[in-house]
Amino acid sequence: MLKKMLKSYDYSLIFAIVLLCGFGLVMVYSSSMITAVSRYGVSSNFFFMRQLFALIAGGALFILMALFPYKALAHQKFQKGILLVSVLALISLFVFGHVAGNAQSWFKIGGMSIQPGEFVKLVVILYLAAVYAKKQSYIDHLLTGVAPPVVMTLIICGLIAMQPDFGTAMIIGLIATCMILCSGFSGKTLVRLVILGGIVFILVSPIIYLNQDKILTEGRLARFESLEDPFKYANSSGLQVINSYYAISSGGIFGLGLGESIQKYGYLPESHTDFIMAVIAEELGIFGVLFVIFLLGFVVIKGFYIARKCEDPFGSLLAIGISSMIAIQSFINLGGVSGLIPITGVTLPFISYGGSSLVLLLGSMGILANISMFVKYSENKKKKEPLAPKGMKKKQLKKTVYL
């Protein structure tokens, strides 16, 4: 049986993930080697070694989650436990959190930085998938079905936004929206939910208005202002986007060559994180960019295909949530690099430097691989199962065939 299950894994998905991680590791070294020495005063391979360590840890988690039956993740006690730990971790950040980039979003443990918000993304996906799978029979009941998980998600998003980390809060909100829309409720319930959301927004509007200076800080307003014409703000909020444009245009079709980027020499401060795609464009040209987009697109499409094929509501919603996370995060990062949307500090999945993000993504991909394995295994089992002749029950057929 184990042999059959191992044969049922989607190895095209696994191969795409391996390619993304390997390519990402190479680009983290290329984009961070100058920054590490000139800006942080550490060895040129400092960020590379940290990313490699995260990749090993994430790879181990991927294997564990790929072998672990995903249905066990829907257990009520497990769900309550991870949700409680997540909320307590987010609250603890206000007391013990380390401030970096104007956000108190990290726990500093020794020489390591852990960002709980990254892991909360997966917790919310697991929670929503389990709750909505369980509520399928009464999901159209607004107050007992669809609404309570929405409230819980809003509380989590609120705690993250207060750090303030609006990028992560926005991603979780968008993932939740995708999952809620795919949870199976009727059009009438959607209308009721929109009305309820409108009422809640009206009620919290005075709080938003009174705290608008904290929400819309000078830096955030500047990002929106520079969106229309970054060259107008070339010495302030538009600087990173302009240097990103220079990197993309310098790369052209074939690029300047691996390791030959000019913009990573202090012109792009976040060359190994938010703006790593600009360095890829500069060094490897349009072919490098298309290679990454193709692989990310393949993973997302494969994820939604697995969700469509999965007959189990929990597995299907889980695959939708994981695929949505990759798609949304990729779009926000690429939109910021190309100047289509304001810069949010969101990294590019599998490619950008970031240990917490990489471990979370590989753990999520392990779950997706496990779902795909069960889907394929079930399909193969159905194909091999003989059809019962008219008037004969399935159990009788099994006895007839195998005795």
Curated annotation (Swiss-Prot):
One record GO biological process: peptidoglycan biosynthetic process
Induction comment from the UniProt entry of this chain: Expression is regulated by YofA.
EC number: 2.4.99.28
Presence of keyword Membrane: yes
Predominant place of localization: membrane
UniProt membrane topology term: Multi-pass membrane protein
Pfam families for the chain: FTSW_RODA_SPOVE (PF01098)
Pathway as given in its UniProt record: Cell wall biogenesis; peptidoglycan biosynthesis
Catalytic activity: [GlcNAc-(1->4)-Mur2Ac(oyl-L-Ala-gamma-D-Glu-L-Lys-D-Ala-D-Ala)](n)-di-trans,octa-cis-undecaprenyl diphosphate + beta-D-GlcNAc-(1->4)-Mur2Ac(oyl-L-Ala-gamma-D-Glu-L-Lys-D-Ala-D-Ala)-di-trans,octa-cis-undecaprenyl diphosphate = [GlcNAc-(1->4)-Mur2Ac(oyl-L-Ala-gamma-D-Glu-L-Lys-D-Ala-D-Ala)](n+1)-di-trans,octa-cis-undecaprenyl diphosphate + di-trans,octa-cis-undecaprenyl diphosphate + H(+)
Extracellular side: 35-51, 102-108, 163-165, 211-285, 352-354
Enzyme class: transferase
Keyword set, alphabetical order: Cell cycle, Cell division, Cell membrane, Cell shape, Cell wall biogenesis/degradation, Glycosyltransferase, Membrane, Peptidoglycan synthesis, Transferase, Transmembrane, Transmembrane helix
Cytoplasmic side: 1-13, 73-80, 130-141, 187-189, 307-309, 376-403
Molecular function GO terms recorded: lipid-linked peptidoglycan transporter activity; peptidoglycan glycosyltransferase activity
Ranges annotated as spanning the membrane: 14-34, 52-72, 81-101, 109-129, 142-162, 166-186, 190-210, 286-306, 310-330, 331-351, 355-375
InterPro entries, sorted: Cell_cycle_FtsW-rel_CS, FtsW/RodA
Keyword Cell wall biogenesis/degradation listed: yes
Compartments it resides in: Cell membrane
One GO cellular component, as annotated: plasma membrane
Family from the record: Belongs to the SEDS family. FtsW subfamily.
Job description of the protein: Peptidoglycan polymerase that is essential for cell division.
Protein name, UniProt field: Probable peptidoglycan glycosyltransferase FtsW
Organism the protein comes from: Bacillus subtilis (strain 168)
Lineage: Bacteria, Bacillati, Bacillota, Bacilli, Bacillales
Gene: ftsW
